[in-house]
Curated annotation (Swiss-Prot):
Cellular localization per UniProt: Secreted, Extracellular space
Region: Disordered, residue numbers: 23-54
Cofactor(s) for this UniProt protein: Cu cation; Ca(2+); L-topaquinone
Active site as annotated: D385 (proton acceptor), Y470 (schiff-base intermediate with substrate)
Cysteine pairs bridged by disulfides in the record: C197-C198, C403-C429, C733-C740
Protein name: Primary amine oxidase, lung isozyme
Positions with a binding annotation for Ca(2+) 2: E571, F662, N664, E666
PTM statement from Swiss-Prot or TrEMBL: Topaquinone (TPQ) is generated by copper-dependent autoxidation of a specific tyrosyl residue.
């Protein structure tokens, strides 16, 4: 019997110091001492290496060796005109990204279930051809790995035609060239007003830019508003707008031809920085002086109080109850494979409970933040984070903060905007967690006396993405009753704007001259459930009060509660608009029945406060048309792998993927189905968001819960459950496993040295 124990780590550290200190060279490796308890059985995260993906790991992200092989092959095939994406200008040809090309589902299942040969392992490369007569974006499938011999252009096949070049993602070099243009060429033209308001000195480095998106107002545009902020060292500059925003047209392939189209300064618009400076010199600009307070103040994340007693620690008295081998997680109840899409973020595959597959894929697709405000940058912004890359901007997980100290940490290899692969250390964590809550329990002292229950212990898979100012904590949680919980929390810095005029219509003032801008957060998920097989049906259930004559007293009438059931036949019937009505029970069911004659099913239960979607008459709405629906169920198709695209951000007016096209009223009866789930919330920033937004109350998601899938509650077979009745000695190990705690937990956790994955270079 495994038991989680809460201990004060402080005690362990004091004990460890007597023997060289916990995590010190002397302390590590000592197994026993007359004055110390023995070390608990454990496995260091270093014992969980990222192995080379073999044929059994169909969904494992590409290894460093595979990434290198693909890059070498493409470099050879595409010729000498390729430029390192890290240095590429818009007029260059470069390989933007290489990642795993997911295998077709039919081929994957044939291998997993029927031992057919595994499908070819392939990579997907995105190439920017800025140096061709007709600049374009091309998608290439490369295989087979690990020794590629072919590449296949799939751009037309997937997108119906070539991808216009203006849809390509803004490379880091492009941002650097924009900064060089702004700081070296443009700002000196308004040196007087900027020195007066913002302590500006040419080359002084006290200002930084922050991008917005989308870049313009119609297809073909590539004109982006950039806000300027104080460069606050070792703290979030996002809270320090100076009131200057610049509209940069960077569509030309030659950076020398880029221009400033419009200037916004502290509530007024100007044609150029020259005009702003002229009006300032003429005394026609009312300048608000923005103090530069350096690193001090409430916006720093460095605590102003000394450390206190160490928080509680969860550890494993009898060793971990799960294993991570390559990309596969295995516990006594659950197995699944995990990965990280470079743009779409965390994803899991082949999810099984007690050996039976429940879902083929559960994956994040897109995350969107829509802002409002009375400055141009604030009012225009609709961030579509798949464009920036929710895998690309995954961050190292900090031991003991992002995940429990003793979690298992796994690295991720990627090739993005570079000629060589890189490694993000501690990109994922997997851990088992005592929720401090009974999964089920009952105490009876009526008629008979007994107690039975089981603690809620969950298995968690986690990653974190930091997109500019915001940090997204992505969780997939596996419960012992067969339920899966998918959720995300938001933390980090809010985005802010210069406070003027009617600013309070768009948020709250959070510091002097600073508006915390109102915005929404939404995420979209793909849920490919296979409930008892590939053929599934969609059922909706709710309740109604029905007037009923009382059988034994016909002169009286009551309102009787009853269940209303309906099988949904088409995709239109199973698409539920955000903000509209929806059945409180919606589940996918098999043609199989449980012991009681009900179809075995899995219910989708959303926990979301997304509110109203972007109106459909908005010019950018089609790029995020998935936001129209809180839930939609469609036929699964290989031609509809994702609800969004990395290219939607830079051309939302003619989106590369329009999710609404997936819903075309096809039958969903007895088909392989995918549920698409939206979760989100409204955020009106307030004083308590300074310096950081907290995760409390800022988490949403959904549950996948068994609904007549089993014959009874599956945790009845849990080895963690306890039961004792009147007359039994509840303090006996033979009766109650928890009574064995003093013996089972007489060990000290073998704590690894604190580590942090560093600060990746993008």
């Amino acid at each position: 019997m495994f038991i989680f124990i809460f201990l004060s780590l402080w005690t362990l550290l004091v004990m460890g110091r007597e023997e060289g200190g916990v995590g010190s060279e002397e302390g590590v490796g000592k197994q026993c001492h007359p004055s110390l308890p023995p070390r608990c059985p454990s496995r260091s995260p270093s014992d969980q290496p990222w192995t080379h993906p073999d044929q059994s790991q169909l969904f494992a992200d590409l290894s460093r060796e595979e990434l290198t092989a693909v890059m070498s092959f493409l470099t050879q095939k595409l010729g000498p005109d390729l430029v390192d994406a890290a240095q590429a200008r818009p007029s260059d040809n470069c390989i933007f990204s290489v990642e795993l090309q997911l295998p077709p589902k039919a081929a994957a299942l044939a291998h997993l279930d029927r031992r057919s040969p595994p499908p070819a392992r392939e990579a997907l490369a995105i190439v920017f051809f800025g140096g061709q007569p007709q600049p374009n974006v091309t998608e290439l499938v490369v295989g087979p790995l690990p020794q590629p011999s072919y590449m296949r252009d799939v751009t037309v096949e997937r997108h119906g035609g070539p991808l216009p070049y203006y849809r390509h993602t803004v490379l880091l070099r492009e941002y650097l060239d924009i900064d060089q243009m702004i700081f070296n060429r443009e700002l000196p033209q308004a040196a007087g007003v900027l020195h007066h308001c913002c302590s500006y000195k040419q080359g002084g480095g006290n200002l930084v830019t922050m991008t917005t998106a989308p870049p313009g107002l119609q297809s073909g545009d590539r004109a982006t508003w950039f806000g300027l902020y104080y460069n606050i060292s070792k703290a979030g500059y996002y809270l320090h707008p100076v009131g200057l925003e610049l509209l940069v047209d960077h569509k030309a392939l030659d950076p020398a031809q880029w221009t400033i189209q419009k200037v916004f300064f502290q509530g007024r618009y100007y044609e150029s920085l020259v005009q702003l400076e002229e009006q300032f010199e003429a005394g026609r600009v009312n300048v608000v002086v923005i103090p530069n307070n350096g690193t001090g103040g409430s916006w720093s994340l460095k605590s102003q109080v000394p450390p206190g007693p160490t928080p509680p620690l969860q550890f494993h008295p009898q060793g971990t109850r799960f294993s991570v081998q390559g990309s596969r997680v295995t516990s006594s109840l659950w197995t699944f494979s995990f990965g990280l899409g470079a743009f779409s973020g965390p994803r899991i595959f082949d999810i099984r409970f007690q050996g039976e597959r429940l879902a083929y894929e559960i994956s994040l697709q897109e995350a969107v933040a829509i802002y409002g405000g009375n400055t141009p940058a604030a009012m225009l912004t609709r961030y579509m984070d798949a464009c920036f890359g929710m895998g690309k901007f995954a961050t190292p997980l900090t031991r003991g903060v992002d995940c429990p100290y003793l979690a298992t940490y796994v690295d991720w290899h990627f090739l993005l905007e570079s000629q060589a692969p890189k490694t993000l250390h501690d990109a994922f964590c997997v851990f088992e967690q005592n929720k401090g809550l009974p999964l089920r329990r009952h105490h009876s002292d009526f008629i008979s006396q007994y107690f039975g229950g089981v603690v809620e212990t969950v298995l968690v898979f986690r990653s974190v993405s930091t997109l500019l100012n915001y940090d997204y904590v992505w969780d997939m949680v596996f419960h012992p009753n067969g339920a899966i919980e998918v959720k995300f929390h938001v933390t980090g810095y809010i985005s802010s704007a210069f406070f003027f005029g009617t600013a309070q219509k768009y948020g709250n003032q959070v510091r002097e001259n600073t508006l915390g801008t109102v915005h929404t957060h939404s995420a979209h998920y793909k849920v490919d459930l296979d409930v008892g097989g590939l053929e599934n049906w969609v059922w909706a259930e709710d309740m109604a009060f029905v007037p009923t004559t009382v059988p034994w007293s016909p002169e009286h009438q009551i309102q009787r509660l009853q269940v209303i059931r309906k099988q949904l036949e088409t995709e239109e019937q199973a698409a539920f608009p955000l903000g509209g009505g929806s059945p409180r029970y919606l589940y996918l069911a098999s043609k199989q029945s449980n012991k009681w004659g009900h179809p075995r099913g899995y219910r989708i239960q959303t926990v979301s406060f997304a509110g109203r979607p972007l109106p459909q008459n908005s010019s950018t709405e089609r790029a995020i048309s998935w936001g129209r629906y809180q839930l939609a169920v469609t036929q699964r198709k290989e031609t509809e792998p994702s609800s969004s695209s990395v290219f939607n951000q830079n051309d939302p007016w003619t989106p590369t993927v329009d999710f609404a096209d997936f819903i075309n009223n096809e039958t969903i009866a007895g088909k392989d189905l995918v549920a698409w789930v939206t979760a989100g919330f409204l955020h009106i920033p307030h004083a308590e968001d300074i310096p950081n937004t907290v995760t409390v109350g800022n988490g949403v998601g959904f549950f996948l819960r068994p609904y007549n899938f089993f014959d009874q509650e599956p945790s009845m077979d849990s080895a963690d459950s306890i039961y004792f009745r009147e007359g039994q000695d509840a303090g006996s190990c033979e009766i109650n496993p928890l009574a064995c705690l003093p013996q089972a937990a007489t060990c000290a956790p073998d704590l690894p040295v604190f580590s942090h994955g560093g600060y990746p270079e993008y």
